[in-house]
Amino acid sequence: MRDKIKLVSSAGTGFFYTTDKNKRNMPGKMEIKKYDPVVRKHVMFKEAKIK
């Protein structure tokens, strides 16, 4: 089952991406390096719940 998640920037800008992930294949928290346009750099994004 694919669940919708939010990827929040670790730079503290409040910028986020939304995506989905397969919980069966990836049971832990997702961490991925992506581009944050607020700081204009690639930073780590960490998984958070969509409220």
Swiss-Prot record:
Q: Does the keyword Ribosomal protein apply?
A: yes
Pfam families listed in its UniProt record: Ribosomal_L33
Provide this UniProt record's keywords sorted from A to Z. Ribonucleoprotein, Ribosomal protein
GO terms, molecular function? structural constituent of ribosome
Gene3D superfamilies xrefs: Ribosomal protein L33 (2.20.28.120)
GO-annotated cellular components: cytosolic large ribosomal subunit
Q: GO biological process: what's one of them?
A: translation
Question: What protein family does this chain belong to?
Answer: Belongs to the bacterial ribosomal protein bL33 family.
Q: Which PANTHER family match?
A: 54S RIBOSOMAL PROTEIN L39, MITOCHONDRIAL, LARGE RIBOSOMAL SUBUNIT PROTEIN BL33M
Protein name in the entry: Large ribosomal subunit protein bL33
Record the organism.
Alteromonas mediterranea (strain DSM 17117 / CIP 110805 / LMG 28347 / Deep ecotype)
